[in-house]
Regions:
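Charged active-site motifs of nucleotide-sugar-dependent glycosyltransferases
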Residues: 31-33, 102-103, 159
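Conserved beta-alpha
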Residues: 70, 74-152, 156
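Proline-aspartate-enriched helix->loop->beta-strand connector
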Residues: 153, 157-166
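Short beta-strand segments
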Residues: 37-39, 107-108, 164
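Generic short amphipathic/hydrophobic targeting helices enriched at N-termini
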Residues: 1-4, 156
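N-terminal nucleotide/polyanion-binding subdomain common to many enzyme families
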Residues: 3-88
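Conserved acidic residues
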Residues: 60, 131, 159
Length: 166
């Protein structure tokens, strides 16, 4: 996986210099783009955990979610970085993908929240193409990747897999 955008280093993490529209367009038009939504908590956790930092830094896009991250980018690197709000990015990408019939799969969260979210998305965006979802119980990282759930996800071949585990 290669970073596809310019980035700046904040603490130990490389944060993409981007905006909501640019990220949404990449997510809709490119395949296998790993994207992290990074707020201040993410950066602190990455600073303390070298393995987590290595994983996040390997992603193609690391969005500056949260005012402190965007502001740090502006101050430290004299750029015009704006906040790339994860929720707004999610909605913009859903909306932008309607014309292209982009398919979505949701992984994480809990059953009740996910069903309510899907219901709301179907009202807001008629024609949204949701292939499925899986809400794992609290498990260790190896259990999260149990073969049956991975196979289900791979069989459906969604264009975008939205992951919410934290």
């Amino acid at each position: 996986i290669v970073s596809i955008m310019d980035s700046v280093r904040i603490l130990k993490t490389d944060i993409s210099v981007t905006n909501i529209n640019e990220v949404s367009e990449v997510l809709i038009n490119e395949k296998k783009i790993y994207t992290a939504i990074c707020n201040a908590n993410t950066l602190v956790r990455c600073y303390k955990d070298e393995n987590l930092n290595k994983i996040i830094n390997s992603f193609s896009i690391k969005c500056p979610d949260g005012f402190p991250v965007a502001k740090a980018s502006k101050i430290l690197y004299k750029n015009n970085q704006e906040r790339v709000d994860g929720y707004k990015l999610f909605l913009e990408t859903i909306k932008a993908g309607l014309n292209k019939k982009t398919t979505h799969y949701f992984y994480g969260n809990n059953e009740l929240t996910t069903k309510k979210m899907i219901e709301k998305l179907e009202k807001l965006y008629p024609g949204i193409n949701i292939l499925g979802y899986y809400c794992p119980p609290f498990l260790d990282s190896e259990q999260l990747l149990e073969r049956e759930h991975v196979d289900d996800l791979l069989d459906k071949k969604p264009d975008i897999i939205w992951v919410s585990l934290g």
